[in-house]
Design a protein with these regions (language model features):
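N-terminal module-boundary/linker segments of secreted carbohydrate-active enzymes
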Residues: 1-22, 151-155, 166-173
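Glycine/proline-rich, flexible active-site/cofactor-binding loop segments
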Residues: 6-67
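Domain-level detector of nuclease and nuclease-like folds
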Residues: 55-173
Length: 173
């Protein structure tokens, strides 16, 4: 398990999803990129279109999900990022991290709640076929924000990708 740094609160990473210039939020954009968007009706007061309601296969569980039963997962959880160094960042960097599309994935709400703030040594997607992609994405986010992952997590990430070439450079793992 990682060392815990006191003082974490969700609000340290902003009060919610960032509002974007087009009137959408980071959450809306993630839903659109996952499900597609329904064009807004002419004259609609809401500039952000609704996501399509067609089910897709959830990336962690493989079960069907729709926009009504999902949450956005921070691939590298905010509390974990805090413990790994985000506690020392300025507020704008923490807010950018919380809203970075590289670190967000639309998943079944239950899967996100099960994962909580755990890193790979404590939690991996239940579907084996998703584990290497998850490890790769988490490593990319950690690298982008210069956060060093604990050895136990790196070991689990390597295990998830054993036999898969090109996961990470030697520096990251």
């Amino acid at each position: 398990p990682r060392a815990t740094v006191l003082g974490y609160s969700r609000e340290a990473f902003g009060t919610g999803w960032a509002s974007l210039a087009d009137g959408c939020t980071t959450r809306s954009k993630a839903l659109h990129s996952t499900f597609g968007a329904v064009p807004a009706a002419a004259g609609s007061p809401d500039p952000c279109p609704a996501p399509r309601n067609d089910p897709i296969r959830g990336p962690y569980t493989g079960t069907p999900i729709t926009p009504h039963d999902v949450e956005l997962d921070h691939v590298l959880p905010l509390a974990a990022a805090w413990d790994l160094g985000a506690h020392a960042w300025e507020q704008p960097r923490r807010e950018a991290f919380a809203n970075d599309p590289r670190n967000l994935i639309v998943v079944a709400a239950a899967a996100n709640q099960e994962k909580s703030d755990q890193l790979p040594s404590e939690w991996m997607p239940p579907k084996r076929w998703q584990r290497c992609a998850y490890a790769h994405r988490l490593a990319d986010v950690a690298r982008a924000y210069e956060l060093s992952l604990p050895r136990a997590d790196l070991r689990e990430m390597r295990r998830a990708c054993s036999g898969v070439t090109g996961l990470l450079g030697a520096r990251s793992m």
